[in-house]
């Protein structure tokens, strides 16, 4: 059986002088403390990608930066699904007996570690290099296509989807580490 034993989160915003590895380290330290563990007890690490630190072996780079020597290290890159995918993979690693304590970590510092243009350029590379990138779609365009298809297949309206955004913001209001702290309405979303 596996379960989440600790959580750590850095605040959203500008972090002058801190790299994405530094932010990951701060969050990891908080998560380990919350779990009541010591660094030496971490025997697995899953590390999400960072557009500001685009290293092909980011999990091992982070492990070295953070000062741990896990027996299992894996970098995960599946866009917006990375957090959930890492959580699922951590569960599978524990259930399979590969690791007992898996640290799941990710972090970005785009507001201070990357220019606006560099962020847009990095995020514009998520499509197929031959069939999509030359046409110039961005991540919102991809999600728009998915939403349009979902609406078509399930009879959902734009207002229905707006209600979901309102619900997510309502939940975020109770979280001190949330990116946004003001409530929104369906009218706000639809504007």
Model region roles, listed by residue range:
Residues 82-87:
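Conserved beta-loop-alpha segment that forms the PLP phosphate-binding cup at the N-terminus of a helix
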Residues 72-81:
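A short, structured active-site edge motif that brings together acidic residues
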Residues 1-73, 92-96, 103-191:
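Conserved "HGTGT" condensation-loop signature of ketosynthase/thiolase-family condensing enzymes
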């Amino acid at each position: 059986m596996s379960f989440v034993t600790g959580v750590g989160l850095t605040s959203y915003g500008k972090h002058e002088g801190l790299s994405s590895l530094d932010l990951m380290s701060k969050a990891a330290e908080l998560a380990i403390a919350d779990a009541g563990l010591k660094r030496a007890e971490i025997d697995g690490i899953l590390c999400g990608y960072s557009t500001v630190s685009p290293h092909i072996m980011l999990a091992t780079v982070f492990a070295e930066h953070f000062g741990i020597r896990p027996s299992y290290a894996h970098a995960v890159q599946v866009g917006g699904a990375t957090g959930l995918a890492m959580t699922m993979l951590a569960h599978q690693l524990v259930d399979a007996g590969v690791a007992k304590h898996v640290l799941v970590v990710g972090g970005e510092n785009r507001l201070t570690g990357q220019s606006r243009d560099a962020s847009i350029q990095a995020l514009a590379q998520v499509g197929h290099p031959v069939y999509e990138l030359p046409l110039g779609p961005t991540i919102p365009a991809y999600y728009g296509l998915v939403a349009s298809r979902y609406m078509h297949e399930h009879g959902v309206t734009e207002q229905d989807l707006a209600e979901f955004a309102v619900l997510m913001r309502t939940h975020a209001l109770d979280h001190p580490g949330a990116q946004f702290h003001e409530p929104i309405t369906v009218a706000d979303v639809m504007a």
